[in-house]
Amino acid sequence: MNTNQLSRRDYLKLMGAGAAVAASDLSIAAAPVSLTADDKADRERRMKWWHEAKFGLFIHWGLYSVVGRHEWVMENEGTPVAEYEQLAKRFNPKPNAARDWAKLARRAGQKYMVMTTKHHEGFCQFNTATTNYCAPKQAAGRDLVKEYVEAARAEGLRVGFYYSLMDWHHPDGARCAEDEAARKRFVEYIHTHVRELMTNYGKIDILWYDVAWPLDAKGWESEKMNEMVFRLQPDIIVNNRNKLQGDFSTPEQRIQAEEGDRAWESCMTMNGSWGYHRADDDWKSPKTIIRNLISCARDGGNYLLNIGPKADGSIPEESIRILSSVGAWMDKNGQSIYNSNRCQPRRSNYASFTRKGNTLYAHVHFWPGDTVAVAGLMTKVKSAKLLSTGQKVDFKQDELRVRFTGLSEKAPDDPVTTIAIECEGEPKQDNIYVRRERKREQA
């Protein structure tokens, strides 16, 4: 096989063979390969909207929301399966809670949503023929995934499904690693869920697998699973957590850019938990969230920010406050984020940067006063303005720096002020130019 020219089918096979990594390690330990020109073009077509979107909403919601003590409560508190199952009798959210999620996402400037259709606890939020342990056959009495899909579409948002391969509830969920008959039963159960999700809800934009413990790609029959997904949803994009490389990588709770043109998305919480945790008050500030979004956009990635609704589907007030603040900033400054390009300039004591074409956006987190300076910018500046108001900003450029002058002593915008800098070409920064070229006094 010529690994430099692989069809999608051969590519999936190779990834299945080479991607046996520990469940706790979400990286992909596979040899670098290149797709055929046709497969590259197909991936670019499918991912175009995603690269432009930059910002999405993650929703972790399930039976653990009833307990309100973290989404891993079943495992971390050693709850027996029969005891945990009783939570399904208390999980009866208010109708169409997802409408509030979607409206909040749109106000926050997010362009897509990803909801947990089944988390590690094994409870299915969708109607399935495989088990009675699902929302339509328990207290909720309805398909919660269907409500979510309809809500997202009503707000013009792209639809993503999270699905956990690991399952603490299914009898074969652990023994499948040692018992071939159990593996076959369990894999058929999982593949049936994926088929139902890809068949019953119209066009789906993202499939977001999670935790592939305890099997490898061969055990999960991941190649077969992905081929089914693409057959049923030819425009979908999939992540890398079923032990195949997929279309994009998923650094968790950190911002870590991929090398080359590999797509990536940082998923992060607003506090310390993915699911609703009533006692977790360690909330990130809107400023921190905005800085994270800027950092992701700067390095060519996406930012998937999580909320953990309560059992009734309502959103914690602090999440609403944070996302509303982020949305107010995005209303004025979203141009610097959406459809932005990887940005080489990155060094400043008080700012970070994004880029769109030849326009450099300096996001000033710590306002220095009436003058903002950027050292080592090697591209000639044509003009500058405050992005939120369009107000012209005066500047002076010499070989060492660009100084933007005549600004107010107090930051014009809260929590981050953005200066749009139009350059003659793609903006480039030499990080050691000043150190190397600045004239020094003779001793």
Positions of the model-derived regions?
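N-terminal secretory signal peptides
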Residues: 1-10
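Mature catalytic domains of secreted/periplasmic carbohydrate-active enzymes
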Residues: 12-22, 31-443
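Cleavable N-terminal signal peptides
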Residues: 27-28
